[in-house]
């Protein structure tokens, strides 16, 4: 079998006004680097597929509170992750069995978080049963994780699908999820934030049922879901003058509804697509946490999106996107974006207009999103 080598490197330098401190601190600055080197192959027979891979990932993040005077406050984090993984798929008369294992070692060197390391191992096993001549599929599975600083945890899951007709499928799933605290949650301290080395891992039990319809031209997915979480990690403070402290919230229940539709049609010989999406989310985090919370202030209650992807000329495509969002605390915003793509053989040119009507809004944390902007791009295909 051939051996594949993948490598990548990216670097970004940007102003970080409002990312971590008050937006009034206008000289914040950040630089990030990300590197990846991996070697993989595929070993395959009639019924068995094995995909082994070894990899190394490196990340570097430098933050400066005052760009021209780093001595006032500066963070530098360097992470390295070395690992090996194998994914196996076996097809038999009773269905498809999937198995995977990933073992890695992570090192972090930081002037704020300290020098730390942990060993991680992830293992999963699942089997997909096809029943009733393929109209019913059942996939039970289990995942086991090990972290040297949080030990072993196992979380099972179950997916069930029922094919009502060629166009309609009903599905349901349930499972347990688990997330350990990040190094930032545990150890990060600055002028507005205090980490907590005594945090417990988050745990949640999630359930979802839904329906999928596909007629070729028209597709839609409808789903309702419920998630009961315990030990949810949030940064909270009793008042606006205090620091945020990483804290485990006792329990949070999240319920919601999701609808996505696509309609495809032709004008002359060109494809056109109209898409709509709506998400409703309701949780009781504000009832659980009476203090000021980074998480609850950013919870979206309603989100509506629409997109029109069109083509009227051979080499020109265009998109128009609209998004409306409303948060649990009542604030809302509307954003319009548009783009044009011109394809000429192996070269593509793009022009993208973001936030056309210059809406002032925040998507995460307290970081104001950019005002109206125009981006130009070019892609060359070998």
In which residue ranges do the predicted regions lie?
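Transmembrane beta-strands of outer-membrane beta-barrel proteins
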Residues: 3-7, 50-54, 95-101, 136-140, ...
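Residues on the lipid-exposed face of transmembrane beta-strands in outer-membrane beta-barrel proteins
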Residues: 1, 39-43, 84-90, 123-129, ...
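Outer-membrane beta-barrel signature, preferentially recognizing the C-terminal barrel domain
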Residues: 21-44, 169, 173-230, 237-266, ...
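Gram-negative outer-membrane beta-barrel transporters
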Residues: 98, 131-132, 226-228, 248-326
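Flexible loop and strand-edge segments within Gram-negative outer membrane beta-barrel domains
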Residues: 1-81
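Transmembrane beta-strands of outer-membrane beta-barrel pores
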Residues: 9-13, 45, 56-60, 92-94, ...
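Structural signature of Gram-negative outer-membrane beta-barrels, strongest in the C-terminal barrel
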Residues: 4-8, 41, 94, 112-229, ...
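C-terminal beta-signal and adjacent terminal beta-strands/loops
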Residues: 228-230, 315, 338-382
